[in-house]
Design a protein with these regions (language model features):
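Intrinsically disordered, low-complexity, positively biased terminal segments
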Residues: 1-32, 195-278
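Conserved active-site alpha-helix within GNAT-family acetyltransferase domains
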Residues: 164, 174-196
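Conserved GNAT acetyl-CoA-binding A-motif
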Residues: 133-134, 161-175
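Conserved acetyl-CoA-binding loop-helix of GNAT-fold acetyltransferases
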Residues: 138-162, 184
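Residue-level detector of beta-propeller blades
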Residues: 119, 187-191, 253-256
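A conserved beta-strand-loop-helix scaffold within acyl/acetyltransferase catalytic domains
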Residues: 44-141, 259-260
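Conserved beta-strand-loop-alpha-helix junction that forms the acyl-donor binding cleft
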Residues: 169-180, 234-237
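Short amphipathic alpha-helix that is part of the acyltransferase structural core
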Residues: 2-86, 94, 219-236
Length: 278
């Protein structure tokens, strides 16, 4: 186990990045503005109710379009405000324009010498009715712009701490790239395996812990523990519907025990099972 607080790539990122928070000023005292010891400077505590925040919020919208636009899942600007910036807090890392590509500077409308901070990652989680539980709405990263892999994972760990979240629930596509990032936080409780309520029914609803020890481990880059798989589920409609029916019986907790595995006859996910006490 590493003795250092952050993995080497994350330490390098913090040499040229600063954390930011977007939330109304009246909410700041309820947030952890030093997540895992990384202080959010006063200049990057952005109040979305102020005219002065307009340019930075435009950059966040453009960042989201860069990461989710190709999947037709980019958020309209009003969704950021209604679902993220007012009821919760948006967190991420920002860097100077000189550290990003000329193409991205053109997208953001900044010059290489501009003394501004432009966002390159973001994390959004929305509080649920259960105290301490948040629903993960968005994790976006352009970490490749500064040559850092896994910066979305680091941003998520810090963002969960900003919100003081105890547990995190979210939705992800079984074949999506983000699934590997979520598994860095440990085995994922599978709350739904096939989700007709979502635009993409082959979506799982997952849950994992976000206690300080878990977030510190992720930030160090240490591997999570993984339970043994009881069986593997084929990631097609029939396989996922069968698992969904088992979930709905309510007598067993199923968890995703690792990344899906490609076989000759399709893609399969390892599933752990734990009988629930009546």
């Amino acid at each position: 186990m590493s003795k250092r607080p952050f993995a080497e790539p994350f330490r390098r990122a913090l040499e040229i990045c600063q954390p930011y928070i977007v939330a109304p000023r009246s909410h700041w005292d309820d947030l952890d503005c030093r997540p895992l010891g990384v202080a959010v400077p006063a200049a990057l505590r952005i109040d979305p109710t102020r005219l002065a925040s307009e340019r930075f919020l435009t950059w966040i919208e453009q960042l989201d379009a860069q990461t989710f636009g190709p999947q037709a899942m980019a958020m309209p600007r009003w969704v950021f405000y209604d679902c993220c910036e007012w009821p919760s807090a948006l967190f991420g890392l920002a860097t100077r324009p000189a550290n990003i590509s000329a193409q991205l500077r053109e997208t953001f409308g900044v010059g290489p010498g501009d003394r501004v901070w432009v966002p390159i990652t973001l994390h959004v989680a929305i509080p649920t009715v259960h105290p301490g539980e948040f629903f993960e709405h968005n994790v976006g990263s352009l970490g490749e712009q500064i040559g850092v892999q896994g910066l979305g994972t680091f941003t998520k760990a810090l963002g969960c701490r900003v919100l003081r979240a105890r547990t995190l629930v979210g939705a992800a596509q079984w074949t999506g790239r983000a699934l590997g990032m979520h598994l860095r936080f440990g085995p994922l409780d599978v709350l739904t395996a096939y989700t007709p309520a979502h635009s993409y029914p082959r979506t799982l609803t997952y849950r994992h812990a976000t206690d300080v020890e878990t977030l510190q481990r992720v930030a160090r880059g240490d591997e999570p523990s993984s339970p043994d798989a009881a069986f593997r589920v084929k990631l097609d409609d029939d396989g996922l519907r069968r698992l969904q029916r088992r979930i709905e019986r309510g007598d067993t907790q199923y968890s995703l025990a690792g990344r899906p595995i490609e076989r000759r006859n399709g893609l399969f996910a390892p599933i752990a099972a734990r009988t629930l006490t009546p």
